[in-house]
């Protein structure tokens, strides 16, 4: 049995580093290369920052990949954050179908500003609470030919929080996902398109149902020798009796880098970014980007003046075997900023 284990220790500077709210953005492990080495088994994000607070702290993350291509992931921080989960992707029916699944439990002290742009922009609204989450997701994806894939998707999401009067939500989701993928490389593409649409219907068996639609568009093109222009757009739209714990959010380690994921949330969230990636010398490269986002909902219609700006830059180190290390610093509105260490490109 081959064991791949990473233990990363990180120290934090108060108030200056990115705080990532959703643990699925802290670690995302995916085996996409046939070469077997230590770092090639790690595909995802690890932030050099407190996960949920601006206090000094330290933490560790690990990933264990079994021969059956099932990945066990974990993350622990001194502020009390804990995550444990599994990820898997298995071809079936002679490779015509693949079964993708994810399950994890996470506990974290985190912050909440309220719903909507106005509440998120008011620093005085910040409140603290403890969040527990258990998530199950599964998809059965069929290869339809000509780079097109589609299939059904199901999920179950359970969230409980203490503080702010406490409460609990749970929802069973079912729907479908379809995507078109012509990228030359999933980890760090230089050409191609990735277009994805997902529709999910949710019920908690005790209240009115709610619904979610997600649209994603990525394009990559080599503009000159060693230079790649990458474009990313994501739209998330929810409607019905949506609990606040399942509203779309802005921020994280992939999009709107530099914003606390969850500070801005509402029924609808859109974000876009344009990134220029340039090979500099030998194993060294760099990237710069500009980004923007907006949130709106039932009581607050879309307003262009409420757009959130973002920008940043970073260093790239390409290791033997094709693994790419990413060091990014992003900043946004009102001095929000953060540093992110990632494995492979953000998108």
What is each of the regions a protein language model found here?
Residues 25, 174-281, 289, 296:
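C-terminal outer-membrane beta-barrel translocator/porin domains of Gram-negative envelope proteins
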Residues 75, 83-143, 231-253, 259-265, ...:
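Outer-membrane beta-barrel translocator/channel fold
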Residues 21-102, 168-190, 266-270, 278-285, ...:
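Outer-membrane beta-barrel initiation region
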Residues 1-32:
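Cleavable N-terminal export/targeting peptides
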Residues 48-52, 62, 72-76, 88, ...:
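Transmembrane beta-barrel strands of outer-membrane/channel proteins
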Residues 35, 47-51, 73-75, 123-129, ...:
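Outer-membrane beta-barrel domain signature
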Residues 22, 38-42, 51, 100-223, ...:
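Transmembrane beta-strand segments of outer-membrane beta-barrel domains in Gram-negative
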Residues 58-64, 86-90, 136-142, 154, ...:
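Residues on the lipid-exposed face of transmembrane beta-strands in outer-membrane beta-barrel proteins
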